[in-house]
Curated annotation (Swiss-Prot):
Disulphide linkage map: 18-29, 114-196
PROSITE patterns: G_PROTEIN_RECEP_F1_1, G_PROTEIN_RECEP_F1_2
PANTHER family, per database record: CHOLECYSTOKININ RECEPTOR TYPE A, G-PROTEIN COUPLED RECEPTOR
Name of the gene encoding the protein in the UniProt record: CCKAR
Residues carrying covalently attached carbohydrate according to the record: 10, 13, 24, 190
Compartments, as annotated in UniProt: Cell membrane
Protein name: Cholecystokinin receptor type A
Amino acid sequence: MDVVDSLFVNGSNITSACELGFENETLFCLDRPRPSKEWQPAVQILLYSLIFLLSVLGNTLVITVLIRNKRMRTVTNIFLLSLAVSDLMLCLFCMPFNLIPSLLKDFIFGSAVCKTTTYFMGTSVSVSTFNLVAISLERYGAICKPLQSRVWQTKSHALKVIAATWCLSFTIMTPYPIYSNLVPFTKNNNQTGNMCRFLLPNDVMQQTWHTFLLLILFLIPGIVMMVAYGLISLELYQGIKFDAIQKKSAKERKTSTGSSGPMEDSDGCYLQKSRHPRKLELRQLSPSSSGSNRINRIRSSSSTANLMAKKRVIRMLIVIVVLFFLCWMPIFSANAWRAYDTVSAERHLSGTPISFILLLSYTSSCVNPIIYCFMNKRFRLGFMATFPCCPNPGTPGVRGEMGEEEEGRTTGASLSRYSYSHMSTSAPPP
């Protein structure tokens, strides 16, 4: 039996569905003959094995890298570590108990495993969603409200939030071990098989439950993340625009100074006020002016590097969010659809559509490590450093790569449009 399918199939109306001829890959009608497709088991085994291996390898590698490299244990990476653990849990505890019963056409692992697998799957999805919401809010605070967020943007606070998300998720998903049970059915050879099904007492409870999950795991988190990342994108755009204006103004002032002599006015940010000094004073202040210009160039370069690092992190997190919803929204939408209109849902989703939806839901467990590897340099360095056989690419804890290493200091504040100019000149880069 397909364990993810236990979220989609509640076990009700099995007989009526078979009588109507809605045969599919979800074991609605195992007691009814249907054409055999010899290539389907091979393709199913291949795809599930590929996703399983990628998920186990990728998430284990992410966990290992973050544990071994202390300088990578930033606030955001702590949430990503929790995300990797939940994905690994989904893979290990659910996929084998999904594929094997699907191939054998019988859930052979017993009632306890049926309850455990559905419970862990629901919990892992909930933890992943709550972690993504926490990451988006943490990023919003670090970039848009750097000074106000310094109080709570700490590793200890992140650990408390993660502990709360896990406890909340385990609490919310308690109906799964309570109402998941084995449902017997008669096979074609007149032997009795079992299906693992999530059975609520009545249709009203079924509809309420799936609507509740759709709200707390997708609609509300989706709105929160879209607003947070939208405000972050706006803040980054304003910072880039403000920096471009300042650089253009500085270049114009430099050109004007070179052509018409020293200027009397300055904006107080990037250029120091200058006078008409005597030759002796100019000669004495030349080294100091050169040092000041060098510091300003370092500040400008540091601000640009920090800004680009933050943009890379935001792109990575946005892709994670989009792919997560792309993978899980179909199955939860299908759950809600079937809860309100069982016959129509089974008619349209039976066969290939539901098979694709179920496989897509498991793909979420392997995409996050791929995103880390391709979109973040520090993770790539950490991946290579994990293996002794690989050449040492250097310490993966180089500052500025992830953009969170300096949270709460000048880096986080420098991305605010108004602190962008003042914080960058208040002190040299640490």
